[in-house]
A protein has these predicted regions:
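Beta-strand-rich extracellular passenger or scaffold domains
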Residues: 42-44, 48-540
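Bacterial Sec-dependent N-terminal signal peptides
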Residues: 1-45
């Protein structure tokens, strides 16, 4: 017997439905008071571990505990507390063909429900479910309101049109689908991205075909916004990501990633330290702000407008993209194959493609300017730690980090200085004069070295075919590598300062090869002449 308010309730046998039902003490069985009806061995009934089929919880009634199995139904217009639901999904997730489960009807409330394997809780319009735990493949279908639902181990929540989920927590392998017209607020997503950034995985995490507001995406969490979906005020931490095919507004990247695909739109995105926004071909972003150590990447065919690039923020793009905004130099743009006033630092990069141009480019520490064969960049300003990638088929002019002018054009490279990470390729028939390599890579595919070519600590000179040196190749303090091909002509190779010059699989035909200081390591080398200038210098 169950007491609620001032009324007693009993389980009585319904001869019409052939099942036990909850009844008031005033209810009659075949014209008799309920006290007579309970003579049907009530003790045996209450010892059963499951509720009877088709239990009805009427308005103002409260039922505590119980288990639904084997296509049992519980229809709740009152309150059901602590029920375990293990039936209702036998025919597949969110299928109308299913029978059984717990039905929270208009005005009804389900509290502290546990939905397990094959279990289903249906919250109809006007119904409310709170503090539900869904696990092991169980599901919750919402046309009403669900508050503080937890999805564990393949637990699923389907928010239909008119339904609302507030405060859902999606743990490992959990899955929330917000369908068109559905709303989810305050969701915490802890799963979906275990396979890595933007891996093909749609079996866990949050899928948005309706509206998602104030979602928090933690490590391993993923939110996928379908073309019909919209997300607002999303917070994404490191290891979490958001895939946008629809709309994303006011997203904050605190180390997390946002990928905007063809047809997708992102507005008012804030990229903080280690955050990364990627605009793919056909994707669009507006009003993105890049703060220090944040990164905006706009791929070929992508578009980002009204970008604010603050000091220390990184822009990664090419002249095949469209990007406009402001940086510390003022307004900048990359439009129709022309880039102007771009700042590259902290992982920023600009690729200038063949037939395209860049003007007034600033390349500071951690920034990279890549000018492809047939591309042109003028008024380039290289700062300390800036990286230049080019070959002798490009056209480049500007100043080095030490303030000296350099240029590439017409098959002639003058006064290049290649910092660590930089690379220059000298094509056959072209000439490089007075090149300095400070930890970068200088590749000569034939051509001629003129003036003084200097290799400093960490530098590599790679030869392919025959390269002519009629002047001086000097290796100063530190270690350097000369490898491959052949170096011919009437020039000289000079090693000075401490460190080791490694010469590997290279044929040297020079007027002189002088090891004045340090060490030289030879591997499969033919040398016309070698002279050791002092007793401290030696071959190894």
């Amino acid at each position: 017997m169950k007491r609620h308010l001032n009324t007693c309730y009993r389980l009585v046998w319904n001869h019409i439905t052939g099942a036990f039902v909850v009844a008031s003490e005033l209810a009659r069985a075949r014209g008799k008071r309920g006290g007579v009806a309970v003579a049907l061995s009530l003790a045996a009934v209450t010892s059963l571990p499951v509720l009877a089929a088709d239990i009805v919880v009427h308005p103002c009634e409260t039922v505590n505990g119980g288990t639904l199995v084997n296509h049992d139904n519980q229809f709740v217009s009152g309150t059901a507390d602590g029920v375990t639901v293990s039936t209702g999904l036998e025919l597949g997730p969110d299928s109308d063909e299913n029978t059984g489960g717990q039905w929270i009807k208009a005005g009804g409330t389900g509290r502290n429900t546990t939905v397990t394997a094959n279990g289903r809780q249906i919250v109809q319009a006007g119904g409310t479910a709170s503090d539900t735990v869904i696990r092991d493949g169980g599901g919750q279908s919402l046309n009403g309101l669900a508050v503080n639902t937890t999805l564990d181990n393949r637990g699923e929540q389907w928010v239909h049109g008119g339904g609302k989920a507030a405060g859902t927590i999606i743990n490992q392998d959990g899955y929330q689908t917000i369908k068109h017209g559905g709303l989810a607020t305050g969701t915490i997503v802890n799963t979906g991205a275990e396979g890595g950034p933007e891996s093909e995985n749609v079996s866990s995490g949050q899928m948005v075909g309706g509206t998602a507001e104030s979602t928090t995406i933690n490590k391993n969490g993923r939110q996928v916004i379908w073309s019909s979906g919209m997300a607002r005020d999303t917070l994404i931490y490191a290891g979490g990501d958001q895939t946008v095919h629809g709309e994303a507004h006011n997203t904050r990247l605190e180390g997390g990633n946002q990928y905007v695909h063809n047809g997708g739109t992102a507005t008012e995105t804030l990229i903080n330290r280690d955050g990364w926004q990627v605009i793919k071909e056909g994707g669009t972003a507006a009003h993105t702000t890049i703060n220090q150590k944040g990164k905006l990447q706009v791929n070929a065919g992508g578009k980002a407008s009204d970008v604010t690039q603050n000091t220390g923020g990184a822009l990664v793009t090419s002249t095949a993209a469209t990007v406009t905004g402001t940086n510390r130099l003022g307004a900048f743009s990359v439009v129709a194959g022309k880039a102007d006033n771009v700042v590259l630092e902290n992982g920023g990069r600009l690729d200038v493609l063949s037939g395209h141009t860049a003007t007034n480019t600033r390349v500071d520490d951690g920034g990279t300017l890549d000018i492809r064969n047939g591309g042109a960049a003028t008024t380039v300003s290289m700062g300390n730690g800036g990286v230049l990638l080019a070959d002798s088929g490009a056209a480049v002019s500007g100043t080095r980090s030490d303030g000296k002018a350099f240029s590439i054009g017409g098959g002639q490279a003058d006064a290049l200085m290649l910092e660590k990470g930089s690379s220059f390729t000298l094509n056959a028939g072209d000439t490089a004069t007075d090149t300095t390599v400070n930890g970068g890579l200088f590749t000569a595919r034939g051509g001629t070295l003129a003036g003084t070519t200097t290799l400093n600590n960490g530098a590599t000179l790679t030869l392919s075919g025959k390269t002519v040196n009629n002047d001086t190749l000097t290796i100063r303090e530190g270690d350097a590598l000369l490898q491959g091909g052949a170096l011919t002509g009437n020039g000289s190779v000079e090693k000075s300062g401490s460190g080791t010059l490694t010469v590997s699989n290279t044929t040297l035909t020079q007027k002189a090869v002088n090891l004045n200081e340090g060490k030289r390591k030879l591997t499969a080398v033919c040398s016309h002449q070698t002279r050791i200038g002092n007793l401290d210098a030696h071959l190894i």
